[in-house]
């Protein structure tokens, strides 16, 4: 049984964890293109603190297969419940949005779709094919659920050759059952290991959200475990409680602590590291280290 401290962080958000949502002029272009096509972004559904910055740069992370997840992890803003029917036009709509925004690097993610026979793996591929049909030079990163660990699903996405395959381990081993629903530490490591086994040339990536009660030593252990399965890239960010119904914040890690963890990650051999309070999975994903 998980032993958790009842101590939580102050309800007052530190200044360094605050960011403006931006002005209408900054976000209007991306919002218009996305909303006109009834598309979804994790920027909006996940209430990402960086969405104004990304929208101002005309970038977004597209959320495939609807805004409703078949899981309901305690930290996540995305709605959980009965998943919606797939929109057969979604892959082409995403491709059109990518073209209109002039994107050279695209991140595709999705809700968990445990209701689908292939967990949604084929939908990633269809969307990638639609994007490449318009511009084969676009680089595509995928941020996938764990596909219940089914290697056939992982192989389906790997065969489409994304430039980077991201699957987030989210938290340290001890806190998995506390923070994640229907997911495990070992399975997430196995997903990343499978990608490297299937195609060693594809970059693999994972991320952690700190603030659930983990210790520095546990974070370092997780970074080491990620490196053991060949993970190339990592993101470290601060968990921010979306609402009172979500898991509480147990600690606000400081910018200095994030900087130190980022330096440790680089020393461990991660080739691409993003570490800071407001860092999220696709933050500056297409930019060099």
From Swiss-Prot:
* One Pfam assignment: Radical_SAM
The residues the record assigns to binding [4Fe-4S] cluster 2 are 69, 73, 76
| Pathway annotation from the record | Protein modification; protein lipoylation via endogenous pathway; protein N(6)-(lipoyl)lysine from octanoyl-[acyl-carrier-protein]: step 2/2
Signal sequence annotation: none
Transmembrane feature ranges: none
Keywords tagged on the record: 4Fe-4S, Cytoplasm, Iron, Iron-sulfur, Metal-binding, S-adenosyl-L-methionine, Transferase
Matching InterPro entries: Aldolase_TIM (IPR013785), Elp3/MiaA/NifB-like_rSAM (IPR006638), Lipoyl_synth (IPR003698), rSAM (IPR007197)
Q: Is Metal-binding one of the keywords UniProt gives this record?
A: yes
Free-text cofactor note: Binds 2 [4Fe-4S] clusters per subunit. One cluster is coordinated with 3 cysteines and an exchangeable S-adenosyl-L-methionine.
Molecular function (Gene Ontology), one example: metal ion binding
Gene3D superfamilies, from UniProt?
Aldolase class I
Catalyzed reaction equations: [[Fe-S] cluster scaffold protein carrying a second [4Fe-4S](2+) cluster] + N(6)-octanoyl-L-lysyl-[protein] + 2 oxidized [2Fe-2S]-[ferredoxin] + 2 S-adenosyl-L-methionine + 4 H(+) = [[Fe-S] cluster scaffold protein] + N(6)-[(R)-dihydrolipoyl]-L-lysyl-[protein] + 4 Fe(3+) + 2 hydrogen sulfide + 2 5'-deoxyadenosine + 2 L-methionine + 2 reduced [2Fe-2S]-[ferredoxin]
Please name the top-level EC class of this enzyme.
transferase
Identify one Gene Ontology CC term for this UniProt entry. cytoplasm
Compartments, record wording? Cytoplasm
- The protein's name is Lipoyl synthase 2
Q: Which organism is it from?
A: Gloeobacter violaceus (strain ATCC 29082 / PCC 7421)
């Amino acid at each position: 049984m998980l032993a958790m401290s009842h101590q939580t962080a102050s309800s007052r958000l530190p200044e360094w964890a605050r960011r403006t949502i931006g002005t209408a002029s900054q976000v209007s272009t991306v919002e218009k293109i996305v909303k006109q096509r009834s598309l979804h972004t994790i920027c909006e559904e996940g209430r990402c603190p960086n969405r104004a910055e990304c929208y101002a740069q005309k970038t977004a992370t597209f959320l495939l297969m609807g805004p409703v997840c078949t899981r309901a992890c305690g930290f996540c803003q995305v709605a959980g419940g009965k998943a919606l029917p797939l929109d057969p036009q979604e892959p082409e709509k995403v491709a059109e949005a990518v073209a209109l925004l002039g994107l050279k690097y695209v991140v595709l993610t999705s809700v968990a779709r445990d209701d689908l026979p292939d967990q949604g793996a084929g939908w990633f591929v269809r969307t990638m094919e639609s994007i490449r049909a318009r511009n084969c030079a676009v680089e595509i990163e995928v941020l996938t659920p764990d596909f219940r660990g089914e290697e056939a699903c992982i192989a389906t996405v790997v065969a489409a050759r994304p430039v980077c395959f991201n699957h987030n381990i989210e938290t340290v081993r001890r806190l998995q059952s506390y923070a994640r629903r229907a997911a495990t530490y070992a399975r997430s490591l196995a997903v990343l290991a499978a990608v490297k086994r299937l195609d060693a040339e594809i970059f693999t990536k994972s991320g952690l959200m700190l603030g659930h009660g983990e210790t520095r030593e546990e974070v370092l252990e997780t970074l080491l475990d990620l490196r053991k399965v060949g993970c190339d890239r990592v993101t470290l960010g601060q968990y921010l409680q979306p609402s009172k119904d979500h898991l509480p914040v147990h600690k606000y890690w400081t910018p200095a602590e994030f900087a130190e963890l980022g330096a440790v990650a680089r020393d461990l051999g991660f080739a691409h590291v993003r570490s800071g309070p407001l860092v999220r999975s696709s933050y500056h994903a297409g930019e060099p280290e």
